[in-house]
Amino acid sequence: MKMGNLICTCLFSSKENTNARTTDSLTSYPLPDQHISIRTFRELNQAPTSRRTSTKTAIP
């Protein structure tokens, strides 16, 4: 659970400062961890996108 929360915070922060966060991530997290973060980011991005699309389709 704690790991998931940390990843979520990292994703939200990375959106604000991509350049600064990328450097921090490379130093703080090893390469394998970065791959996991990217995968989680894609999964999280896809879920909200699908929900928004469904809502938009339902409104009209």
Swiss-Prot record:
Belongs to the geminiviridae protein AC4/C4 family. Pathogenicity determinant. May act as a suppressor of RNA-mediated gene silencing, also known as post-transcriptional gene silencing (PTGS), a mechanism of plant viral defense that limits the accumulation of viral RNAs. It holds the Pfam family Gemini_C4. InterPro entries: Gemini_C4. GO terms for biological process: symbiont-mediated suppression of host innate immune response. This is Protein AC4. The keyword Metal-binding does not apply. Keywords: Host-virus interaction, Inhibition of host innate immune response by virus, Suppressor of RNA silencing, Viral immunoevasion. It comes from the Viruses.
